[in-house]
Amino acid sequence: MKSIQSNIKKAKKYLDNNHCVAVPTETVYGLAANAYSNSAVKKIFSLKKRPLNNPLIVHYYDIQRLKEDCDINDNLVKLYKKFSPGPITYVLKLKNNSKISKFVTNNKKSIAVRFPKHKLFRNLLKNLDYPVAAPSANISSRLSSVKPSDVKEEFGSKIKYILNGGKSKIGVESTILNLLEKPSLLRYGGLDTKKIENVLKKKLLINTNSKKKLSPGLFPLHYSPGIPLRVNVKKPKKDEAYLLIKKRKSKLKNYYYLSKMKNIDEAAKNLYSTLRKIKNDGFKKIA
């Protein structure tokens, strides 16, 4: 317990001094910085080599703290009670007097917010006097990090501190909803949209190709292994890594499995780490 509190204090110290810290979430690891500080947020973009017009998700401890920066609507309250903290992000109207850095929102009047579930990250947020902007801890357009070693592989010693929370349980990014008007889906992710529709008692509008870029994950190239991929392949070529959802009996070293029993949640959890392993094993193609 003492070591956990010591690690949280260390992460807090770096964040308080406008440095970036890698943090664990239930989805993927995040690259966190004080969302109220222009200089801190700019470091996120610099480290990730991220375009400034790609907005960031801001993480809050609870809805009470969110009220300082955002207008709260009925749809948010319904979804918050059911799914937050958890793998869902909401795009909301930003208050005029909000302290959120203009670099977080790309000068827009809206903001993407989330309440993470990971206990270690929540403990950190509870002890901060500000929310944190925290996109995925990877170089832009590359594979997201799901464990501390992935973060080190991406950034080396450029990050001041990694708050080690083990491997991410979900392994893919959060589902993003636009709640500015009629609820619409901006990005598929860790929360099933059918569950969301059941709570709202209405169908979501699908707006995953939105040109407004109200949230992350809407650019053409995202979360890429940087290797050519062929789909619906029955037999791979000798120089290809063969990526399968369900495990098959094979002694070939180019077979990679996302799940033992074709479980979609297990497959999602293992996707990024398996793609990263394929790349690190030296394969130049995936089937």
Annotate each predicted stretch with a short phrase.
Residues 1-287:
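Active-site-adjacent structural elements in enzyme catalytic cores
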